C-alpha cells in the first residue's frame, strides 16, 4: 500500500470485511436464514491462513456483532499464517466466534451461505492438493444442501490477471471483489466461474492502492454515454464525414456490403464502397442506395477527400493483395481501419518471446518486425495469431498482456475480437467489453464492427473513442436483438439496429 495514502493494510482489510458484509446483506435478509433452511442456519466462512482468509475473518466478526449466526472453518497450517490473519483470528476468538479446523467440520446441513476465502489473487499455477480436496468437498455439499457459494476477491483457482483457471476450480454464485473488478473476472474462463461480481469499496482510491500500472477499464453504458456527442443542429453530410470502405472479391461480395451499410447506420455523412471493377455492378445491385460504389483499380482518385478509409472485408488473399494493401498505406495519410484480409496481407508484423511471456518479463515480450501507421486494427484471434506469429492457445492464456504490448509497441489502436472483445490503446490502457451475447457468433459480425468504427471516425471521433464506442454500440445492438431471439439474428439486423442504441445513449 503506498505510504502517501496514510492508510494501513489493516484498515483496508477492515474495509474489505465490511464490504463483504454489505454485499451479503445486499442479496439476503441475513436475519431470516433460519426461515429459509432450519432454526440453526448460519453463514459459513471457509478461510485460508493468508490475507484473503483474514478478510473473511473480519466479515465473520462484523456479522456476528450484528447478530447474524456465523461459523468459521480454517484451511491450512495456522502456525504459518500471515501476521494480519493471526491478528484477525485472535479478535474472532476473543468475540467467541465458532471456529473449527476444516477437517473437523461436519455441519453442512445448516449452511445457508458459504463464503470461500482460501487464497485470493495469489494463484498463478496449480492448486495444492489440500485446496483441491476442500473445494471438491464444498461442491459435493453444495449439491446436496443447495446453499449459495461466494468467493472473496476471486475464486480459489482463478488467475486474477489472465482469467485462466486451475483444475478443481468451482463455479461460484457470487464474487465480492475490492476496489475494482479484477481483470480475470472479465475474461473467460474466469468470467464463467466467478458468478455475479459485486465490487466493494476499499476506502482508498483503488488506482493509488494498485500503484503505477497500466489501466484496464470496462466498456459499459456509463462509459459510452460519456463518449457519444450530440450533433449540432446545422449538421449536414459534409460535417458528418466521408468514409471509404475498401474490400470485396469474386468470392466475397457480402463482407464489404455489410461494412459499408454499417458505416451508414452509425451516422457517417457519406459512404463510398470501393470494390474490384469485375464485381462493381453486382454490388451496386445489392447494396442500399445510400452507399456509392466505385472501383479499386483507380485507387488514387478513390482516396481523395476521405475522413477515414477502412480496408479488408472480403478483399481476398490472392497474390496481388499484399502489394495493393501496401499501395493504399503508402498513398493515404488519414485515419485507417484495417480488418480481415488487409491484416492477412500484412503477414507477421511482430514476434513474441514465449519464455519472457511465460516468466512475466513484460518489457521483453514483444519485438516489432514491421512498422505500422497509426490506425485501428480489428483482428479476431486467428488473424492476431498470424500478425504476431503465436498460436491461439498462447493468446488465450495471455489475452490482455499481448493486446496491450501490441498496441504499445506498434502505437496503434487494437480491437481484439474475442470473448470478450478488448480495445488496447498505445498508452497501455485496455478496455474490456462487458456486453454482447453468443448470438453474435456468426459470419459477418466483424465486418459490421469495422463499418461502425469507420462511421464514428468519419464523424470526427478519435480513433480510440471510435473503437470503444464501436464495440459498445455493436454489442448493445446485438443484445437488444437477443431480447427477442437468442440466436438467428443476422449481422444485417445488428447493423440496422445501431441507430436505436445511439438514441438510447443520447437519452432520446
Residue ranges and their predicted role:
Residues 1-75, 82, 86, 174, ...:
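Small-residue (G/A/S/T)-rich helix-start motifs and N-terminal tracts that mark the onset
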Residues 27, 31, 107-112, 143-145, ...:
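Glycine-rich phosphate-binding loop signature in dinucleotide/nucleotide-binding domains
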Residues 58-141, 281-294, 300-301:
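N-terminal small/polar loop signature for handling phosphorylated ligands or for N-terminal nucleophile
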Residues 78, 120-125, 159, 165, ...:
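Short strand->helix junction
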Residues 112-113, 118-214:
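Internal gly/pro-rich beta-alpha loop/helix module
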